[in-house]
């Protein structure tokens, strides 16, 4: 995989971002892309590429839900769901941050669900960037540390455990 990625040159990071974004829209597990980004591009570039792909995919999912499904879903929902949507809209970006930091709803599903609300797009994007950044850093570090460990770097396990600790602190 690494040789193939290197053979792509400048297209490798672009391809990673596009695949991550497309995978997000199609409900592929983001953790796989996050780990791959760290393993293939290192912790810093991997984080930036992962965050770019994740936010592009999240935004695309949000927009698909908003412009292709929101009216239809709203027309079919009952009073209870309409109250939930209204409550989410009232909290706006704060709800987005909370939902991202306390992942009770899977990432890909959350993107579509939030698109059914009237939360402003800019608020959604900025809140998502802010709240997704810590986990994105952790996944890139874990991917990088895993690759280093496979390459025989004994110190990589220490870095991997540190990244897992950060991820656990974010999750709980």
Where are the regions a protein language model picked out?
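Structural signature of transmembrane alpha-helix termini at the membrane-water interface
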Residues: 22-25, 63, 141, 170-171
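C-terminal membrane module of polytopic membrane proteins
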Residues: 131-172
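Transmembrane helix boundary and interhelical junction motifs in multipass membrane proteins
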Residues: 17-48, 104-110, 122, 132-139
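Membrane-helix boundary/juxtamembrane motif in polytopic membrane proteins
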Residues: 117-131
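Hydrophobic alpha-helical transmembrane segments
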Residues: 13-17, 32-36, 44-52, 94-98, ...
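Membrane-interfacial helix-loop-helix
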Residues: 1-18, 51-112, 116-117, 121, ...
């Amino acid at each position: 995989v690494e040789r193939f990625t290197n053979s792509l040159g400048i297209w490798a990071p672009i391809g990673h971002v596009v695949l991550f974004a497309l995978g997000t829209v199609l409900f592929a597990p983001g953790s796989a892309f996050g780990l791959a980004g760290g393993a293939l591009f290192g912790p810093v570039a991997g984080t930036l590429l992962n965050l770019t792909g994740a936010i592009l995919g999240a935004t695309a999912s949000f927009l698909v839900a908003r412009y292709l499904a929101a009216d239809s879903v709203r027309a079919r929902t009952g009073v209870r769901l309409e109250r939930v949507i209204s409550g989410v809209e009232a909290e706006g970006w704060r709800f987005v941050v909370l939902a991202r930091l306390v992942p009770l709803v899977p990432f890909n599903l959350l993107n579509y669900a939030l698109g059914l609300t009237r939360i402003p797009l800019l608020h959604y994007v900025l809140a998502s960037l802010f709240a997704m950044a810590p986990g994105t850093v952790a996944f890139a570090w874990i991917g990088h540390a895993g690759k280093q460990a496979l390459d025989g770097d004994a110190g990589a396990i220490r870095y991997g455990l540190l990244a897992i600790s950060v991820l656990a602190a974010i999750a709980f």
